Amino acid sequence: SKSSTETPPSYNQLNYNENLLRFFNSKPVTAPVELDPPKGESSYVSSAREDARSTLSPVHGFEGSGGSGSSGNFTTGSNVRMSSVTNTSNAGTGTSSAGGNGNGGSGASHAPPVTVTLTESLLN
């Protein structure tokens, strides 16, 4: 007989394999992962693609809280292509690392972000 201290399997554990099979048998449409999206795309379009990628990816579906699309799942996809942005419109604001709108925190610039490739010489 089983020990009385053993925890019975949860509903989710019992249905895990069945859910996996049903998911992959439905042949979900998955978006390809692009590390370098085409240049000249507005940040709105690339963030929409980011949303679609995290929604459609079978890997993200089983992370975190059962694939409900929590913010924990989304950050893994969005951190892939953060760029270092130099804000030249306002003197004294310097450089800032921005992954979103690229305004460098000043809010005054509406120009597209200037992408600077981070190299060892820039760090020295």
Swiss-Prot record:
GO BP annotations listed: rhythmic process
Residue spans of biased composition, Low complexity class: 71-96
Bias (Gly residues) ranges: 97-107
Highest taxon above the source species: Eukaryota
Keywords: Biological rhythms, Cytoplasm, Nucleus, Phosphoprotein, Repeat
Localization per record: Nucleus; Cytoplasm, Perinuclear region
Region (Disordered): 30-124
Primary subcellular site in the record, as a coarse category: nucleus
One CC-aspect GO term: perinuclear region of cytoplasm
PTMs per UniProt: Phosphorylated with a circadian rhythmicity, probably by the double-time protein (dbt). Phosphorylation could be implicated in the stability of per monomer and in the formation of heterodimer per-tim.
Known partners and oligomeric status: Forms a heterodimer with timeless (TIM); the complex then translocates into the nucleus.
Function in brief: Essential for biological clock functions. Determines the period length of circadian and ultradian rhythms; an increase in PER dosage leads to shortened circadian rhythms and a decrease leads to lengthened circadian rhythms. Essential for the circadian rhythmicity of locomotor activity, eclosion behavior, and for the rhythmic component of the male courtship song that originates in the thoracic nervous system. The biological cycle depends on the rhythmic formation and nuclear localization of the TIM-PER complex. Light induces the degradation of TIM, which promotes elimination of PER.
Name under which the protein is recorded: Period circadian protein
Species per Swiss-Prot/TrEMBL record: Hirtodrosophila pictiventris
Designated gene of the protein: per
